[in-house]
Amino acid sequence: LSLEVLAVLIFVVVVGGVIAVVIRAVRGRGKQEEEGGLDLIPYLILAIAVAAAGFALAALARASLTPDRLIGRPTGELAGALASLVVAAPITYLLWRRQARRRKTFPATPGWPVYLAIIELVFLIAFLTAVSQLADFLAGDGEQADWTDLLIYGAIVVFHWWAERREAPRGDIGDLPRLVGSGVALVALTIGLIGTLEWLFSFAYEALWGLGDIPDPAIPIALAVAGAAIWAWRWLPSWEAEPNVLRNFYLGFVTAFSLIMAIGAGVSMIATLLTFVLGEAGPAVDHFDAFPLALSFSIVGWALWYHHGHRLGPGRTGGRRGYEYAMAATGLGTLVGSTTALVAAVFTPTLAGTNSGSTLLTIACAVIASGWVWLTFWRKAQAAPRAEEARALSRRIYLIGMAIILGLTAAGSLIAALVVVFRALLGEIEADTASLRIPVTLTLTAGFATWHLFDQIRADGSGAKTIESKPFAVTVICSHPGTLATLFPDEATVRVLYRGDDAGMIDEEMASAIVAAVDRRSSLVWVDESGFRLAAARES
């Protein structure tokens, strides 16, 4: 047997075994009122089957619609595609019909949005890859235009968009498919915009100075157009549900990443300009040849930051907290690393030559920028009431996570420094004490940052203990409380009365606002489609 046939047989055995286990488990657990975690397994198998069938169909289309038709194609490639399609197509059909019936009984199953997100991730990437390959071919650089990939991958994506609109995912992860599609499209849009702007700026740079390399704009323009269309379709339409944990995480991550991209490009341009002004650079034409790319990164980064930052919402929302603590973590980590690099650059004799000034200026700019980022966002976090801020999950992740990372870094660098010291004390002639600069500096900077973080953890804990622990009761009338009960302190007694409709759902942002508004007082909370209302409860 060939390797392709053997691979298909293994695939059939594995899939058949998994299906048998799933069917046996489903039959054995009896009828349940709610869908359990096992529902994820059929959807994962369905996703694998759809992916296998889709890529096999694309391979067959490429083979049949090219000028040489099937002639000259490797036999194993065609046999593997045919075998995959024969096996995957029936599995796809049967599982699709089965899960469609189960969705009518269990409409809030978590497997449906997970399946849609997997398909969107896989086939959107495949579709955008086909777009770039076709653009490269049309520009005269590619060898072959597999335009059939566009049709097949695009048809699969559009079909699942239609299925999603027909049966909208529900539950806490119902937004997952749209967020995945928005993220993939945003990456393509970002790459396309940066490449297109770099081409425009490089063209202007070459026209002014007569030198420089002009990149090919075909792929960036194609990615920008395709990414913008998909992103506008998946992200810009209004969202039915209020912001939840997933959307807050997405917004916080994208906002933080875009600002990091903009600041990093800005630091690079400032360092390049200062190096030239201070006479530490070569010819201007060669020195500024990286400016078009850095300027493109900066423009796109600021644009993305502006767009997503305005959607974080006012006040201390979950998304805004995540964004600010992510920026504080990035600033603190970069500050520790760049400070260590600056000390090493200052005291390294080999940098006394030609480019020592440019290296020092670049690292110094990084130190200043990272310090400014950390101070700015840490002060924003400190401006919020500590009693409310100390309970935020993003703050705990920042303090504990960074304390562990920087603490381990300080411990590792201290061990490295002690190894050098002990080697010298033991009389090893080749022991170079000059190598102590980096581990000692890293031990001091990371150790000081770790001490600061643990001090804040201790202050948060002591601040929580000093708060009056008077018991109080809260009665909430809503459709679903979400994580509200977990945000109240231990002395709170929370009672939930369900409305019986979907008009009073509580998301993470509203839950934090309710806890802040209650302020450790016995209260009645009414939640409807317009928000929540609060009334003081009579204490017995």
Model-predicted regions and their roles:
Residues 1-413, 418-478, 486-502, 513-531, ...:
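Hydrophobic/aromatic interaction determinants used to assemble and anchor large protein complexes
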